């Protein structure tokens, strides 16, 4: 493959057939160490997960960035909770293969996910967790209106050390409004 900055990527919905590509990307130490993933990912588990996300009634959207048929990044929105009173909230997750980090792929994925949440799902709140030492990811999220809401100390074990996680969220910048019809004469 050529130099990453010279090849355009395309975005599309993730498919169950991407499972092997997800497993390969998640084998990259610098990728999975920034997520809650474990080493040695299983392609069949990814296939099952991607199949459920593509169900016609699922509000989830899982996108991939692809170059010459190879998945180089993924990002998705999924319900943050099962409680009905939190159905206005989606959680966001993202991973980008190391050679493609800091090349605009994350921004392209974020643009599409925010558009989907804002204009097609009516999501009021998108939330995420990011490790406190992942400064490039934090900068990307801030660029899209995410704000720091809190810190979870010793949140996860990573490479033999406990690391903190920052909770960030973005509220819909212009929530949809409803203009009720004028009352009719009875």
Could you tell me what each predicted segment is?
Residues 110, 118-129:
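Conserved GNAT acetyl-CoA-binding A-motif
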């Amino acid at each position: 493959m050529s130099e990453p900055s010279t090849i355009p990527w395309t975005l599309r919905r993730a498919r169950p057939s991407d499972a092997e590509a997800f497993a390969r990307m998640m084998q990259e130490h610098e990728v999975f160490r920034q997520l809650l993933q474990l080493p040695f990912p299983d392609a069949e588990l990814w296939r099952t997960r991607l199949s459920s996300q593509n169900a016609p009634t699922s509000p989830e959207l899982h996108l991939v960035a692809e170059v010459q048929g190879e998945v180089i990044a993924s990002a998705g929105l999924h319900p943050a909770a099962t409680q009905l009173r939190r159905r206005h909230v989606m959680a966001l997750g993202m991973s980008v293969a190391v050679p493609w980090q800091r090349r605009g792929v994350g921004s392209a994925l974020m643009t599409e996910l925010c558009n989907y949440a804002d204009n097609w799902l009516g999501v009021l709140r998108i939330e995420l967790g990011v490790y406190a030492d992942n400064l490039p990811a934090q900068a990307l999220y801030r660029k899209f209106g995410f704000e720091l809401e809190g810190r979870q100390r010793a949140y996860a074990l990573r490479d033999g050390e406990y690391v903190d996680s920052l909770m960030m969220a973005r509220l819909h910048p212009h929530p949809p409004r409803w203009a009720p019809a004028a009352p009719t004469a009875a």
